[in-house]
């Protein structure tokens, strides 16, 4: 049984979820949000992200990281900060010996909902169904 840590990185908050998989069956373990200190410069925020992810890794011992590939953003500053957060998250996982898997947003939506053009709400709805979470 493999344990997978999924991360949706951001410079203000980072979402995460942990599942266990066996074959095509996925079982929900935990999820949450890492809130970063927005009153701090980006460097200390990345430090909080890195150490918070290390705590999650210590507790749940994931084998793999699933993270969305970089996409083009309209705001270059926001894209740069997102890239920093992705880098901190990936570094924390690689530092702990995890395998890193990057997926395009369309690929994730296609796998979860059946269409690469699915909305966030459609993805959220299907994740609840697939992991048997309360509505």
Segments from the language model and where they lie:
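Phosphate- and other anionic-substrate recognition elements at nucleic-acid/protein interfaces
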Residues: 1-135
